[in-house]
Amino acid sequence: KYLSFFSWVLFISFAAAEDNRCYELRVYTANEGKLDALNARFRDHTCKLFEKHGFTNVGYWTPAEKSDNRLIYVISSPNRKSHNESFKSFLNDPDWKNAYRASIKNGKLVAKIESTFLKTTDYSPKIESTITKNPRIFELRTYVTANDRLDNLNARFRDHTCKIFENHGMKNVAYWTPTDENKGSANTLIYIISHKNQNQAKNNWKGFISDEAWKKARAASVKDGKILASAPKNVFLK
């Protein structure tokens, strides 16, 4: 969703044309007690200034786990060059400088920033924004493959996993791979799905794992060797 106080969420269309946009996943770890102030800065200033300088606000979330003090968001631009130019103009905007100075009068808000540039996979749903009255729980998942197995993982999602997710109440939101080698371009899949709520997510996964179609697809996909190098990482988001 596009920050909870805006009540916007990602809207999925499966009639998606090829998406060549540059996406950036940014993770801000707030200093202790500063997450609310960080959200306020985005709500009142940053999101609007991003749009002013050519960014598209794709989605903003905070972890469902209350002890996790991160803000996780995705923005996009037509391409990497324009993305970098937009950030430069954003940082030089007097309105941003004023908002930033005002926000840190009582201490800096952010302890750490992580950034990953992304491109959509050929099976990712189209990513748009719409307004909804029904909040959802989102799940951000990261898979790291064994050597030379990313194509196999993508094939399994394209041909089987995404469809089976839908059969078990999971909505496919977006699928990406990193564009930079040092961020895992050769072995990493990052995706977002959604559930009605976190309790339902447990049931959705239980149904998926026990699905015979999934068991067959997984068994066939690993006949010539394992696909994943390690267990997937996930975080529930709201």
Range-by-range predicted roles:
Residues 8-17:
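Hydrophobic h-region of N-terminal signal peptides that target proteins for export
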Residues 1-6:
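Bacterial N-terminal signal peptides that target proteins for export
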Residues 16-98, 102-215, 220-238:
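Short S/T/G/P-rich N-terminal loop/turn motif that feeds into the first structured element of a domain
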